[in-house]
Amino acid sequence: EYIMNMKYTITTPLYYVNDKPHLGSSYTTIACDAIARFQRLCGNTVLFLTGVDEHGQKIERTAESKNLQPQLHCDEITEKYKYLWDKLNISYDRFVRTTSEDHTSLVHQFYSKVLKSDDVYMGRQSGWYCVGCEEYKDVDEDDKSPICSIHKKELEWRDEENLFFKLSKYQDQIEKLIQIDGFI
């Protein structure tokens, strides 16, 4: 039996604005839209979010390659997403931009709580990094000019301070949860 009067929050990924929307963006958004519409038809309350992630080095570099300020580039691509969602009649309730004041304020509040929680620590991270993948890559230490196998571009050496999550702090709780039948 289906339970009615439930509350649902449905969100797409926040799409990177390093390039215009593509089929993968549409696919995910249409799937979320179908779920949101179904839940509304069932009488449930739905908050359907979509939006864009306007941070990252690949966005900055894309803007630079077009001789644009990063925010102007973000504004242009964001409008393309909104235009496409309107053309596809996507029924989102809120469009999130990671550069908006309300999002920035919420992130600052969350970040402040995380720092007080003792769940993170500062540490050094170094290695070969792919800007396109936004991740460190395992590379043979003899390779002096490694290439990303996905983007076919040279990796960059990074040595930086980052925040790390203290997963080990929750090891006992996680192990107990994993043992519960049906949890995973």
Where are these regions (language model features)?
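N-terminal, positively charged nucleic-acid-binding surface of large information/translation enzymes
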Residues: 4-184
